[in-house]
Amino acid sequence: KETEQEHNDQTKAVRWALNNLKGIETIHILGATGGRADHTIGNTSLLMEYTRMFDLKDITIEMVSDDGTIFPINDTIEFECGPGRSISIFTPDNSLRIRSEGLMYPTDDVVFDNWWKATLNKTVQDNVRLELSHRSIALIMLD
């Protein structure tokens, strides 16, 4: 039983999984939206923090909800998702530039000075590539 109160239950569960499930490749977080907007924003933003807090090399962490899948990135990534999917990209780093391939609306010139800037996009290829200008944190949301 965790007694510390510096972190929320989601973070405690992720930390427990990383410490106790050796060889783990993927962590799926379910039920993290809680039916409340503030709960959803808080828990999804924590996904980005996990890339800083924990050594996630070779470990995929994603939040699954009725609305889709959300996962953090901290470097250039290419992933398979198929064409026609809704995709949104969020980052708190307004100095970050993300060059994209496989999206209907390229993100190359997006200035991430507000969360809505790269939302409501569509995938147009089997694979999406997001090239970050520097290591940072961002969230990807797929329907």
Give residue ranges: language-model regions.
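Class I SAM-dependent methyltransferase SAM-binding "motif I" and its flanking Rossmann-like core
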Residues: 38, 49-82
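Long, charged alpha-helical interface segments
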Residues: 66, 73-143
